[in-house]
Regions:
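Solvent-exposed soluble domains appended to multi-pass membrane proteins
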Residues: 182, 186, 222-223, 327-336, ...
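Hydrophobic alpha-helical membrane-insertion segments, chiefly the h-region
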Residues: 18-28
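Extended, well-ordered protein cores
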Residues: 174-177
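Secondary-structure boundary elements
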Residues: 180-255
Length: 346
């Protein structure tokens, strides 16, 4: 303080320099953020055929793939309830299978797999929720919850050791479907299909990949509403039926029919539109690198253009952090988000 009193001019000069440097750094950052690798990429024609979505399935081992195909078939055939896996798996394998089932194309808005159990019906995550700590092949059974099941609102009961004590009752309630609810699922599938076709009809036939991306993002911005913190609403839910109706419903392509979607829902809609427009696209999950050590789960959509992989923020929820950019290079994306490490994304 005494120095400042004695050297007012020097102190003022230092303050001016600091302000100028700060302004320069801020200007440089804005300039860098405004320059997009995406803008520099050459336009590229779209494919003529619908792109197959097998990014995750193609990375599964034979063992994991067998369980994946089994669960996918049960889901599509609406065979809910307790299911015994063809191949017992460890925690990492289970997570890879469930992730592939969740992200791989099919619009399973009406159901999901959960409650991994041992052969003796013990819920393996009863005490410790970290599935990756399960290193032995002890996951032999799971439960497929379907919104059309008569007993979808039944709650599980657990013994002190984690055994599902009312599993027989759960199985009976989840293995029988209500015809009216099945009809509702089929109706919504048709409505979703019609909406996807309507969106694609607005895309010029001669448009390239970049033009298609811009069109899909603009459509989502103008026609969909973001569901704020859907996961937070899980508090107070009594059963899996509540989860399906109030949270899970917004995580799928079928959320088009409600004009509301979560970050995951936006990403799935965008990728599905890309596939139908002849463009390879897959979801990339990870942890967003926020400030002060904070992190949250987030989703990008990866699209191949001009020999590079572009990462698209379909929901636009990180618009402010990204300086208004919606399409990032791989380097930019990895600087912003730590990709999940149980699949290969490069």
């Amino acid at each position: 303080m005494n120095y400042i009193r004695k050297h007012k001019k020097a102190a003022l000069l230092i303050a001016v320099v600091v302000v100028v440097l700060f302004a320069f750094v801020t200007w440089q950052r804005k300039l860098t953020m405004s320059k997009s690798v995406y803008d520099e990429l050459k336009e590229e024609p779209r494919g003529e055929a619908v792109e197959k979505d097998d990014f995750y399935y193609s990375q599964l081992t034979a063992k994991e793939g067998e369980d994946f195909l089994f669960l996918k078939e049960q889901m599509e055939n609406l065979n809910g309830g307790v299911l015994e896996l063809p191949q017992p798996v460890n925690g990492k394998e289970y997570q890879r299978i469930i992730t592939a089932l969740e992200y791989e194309g099919a619009d399973n808005f009406y159901g999901f797999v959960d409650i991994p159990m041992t052969e003796d019906n013990v819920y393996v995550l009863y005490e410790d929720k970290d599935v990756f700590k399960i290193t032995e092949d002890k996951i032999s059974k799971v439960i497929l919850f379907l919104s059309c099941a008569e007993g979808i609102h039944l709650s599980g009961e657990f013994a002190e050791d984690g055994m599902v004590s009312n599993l027989e009752k759960i199985q009976k309630g989840l293995s029988v479907n209500e015809e009216e609810k099945v009809a509702e699922i089929e109706k919504r599938q048709k409505e979703t299909e019609a909406l996807l076709e309507e969106i694609l009809q607005g895309l010029p036939a001669d448009s390239g990949k970049k033009e298609a991306i811009d069109y899909f993002l603009r459509w989502l911005d103008e026609n969909m509403e973001f569901v704020q913190k859907a996961a937070a609403t899980t508090e107070g839910m009594q059963n899996m039926g509540d989860m399906l109706e109030k949270v899970y419903d917004f995580n799928h392509v079928a959320s088009l029919t409600k004009k509301k979607a979560s970050t995951l829902g936006y990403a799935k809609i965008f990728s599905e539109l890309c596939h139908r427009a002849g463009m390879e696209s897959h979801l990339v999950m990870g942890s967003w690198n926020g400030g002060w050590g904070q992190s949250e789960m987030y989703i990008f959509c990866a699209v191949s253009i001009d020999g590079q992989t572009v990462y698209v923020d379909a929901s636009g929820q990180k618009n402010a952090s990204l300086g208004g950019k919606r399409c990032l290079s791989e380097k930019e994306a990895k600087n912003r988000m730590t990709f999940a490490d149980y699949f290969e994304y490069s």
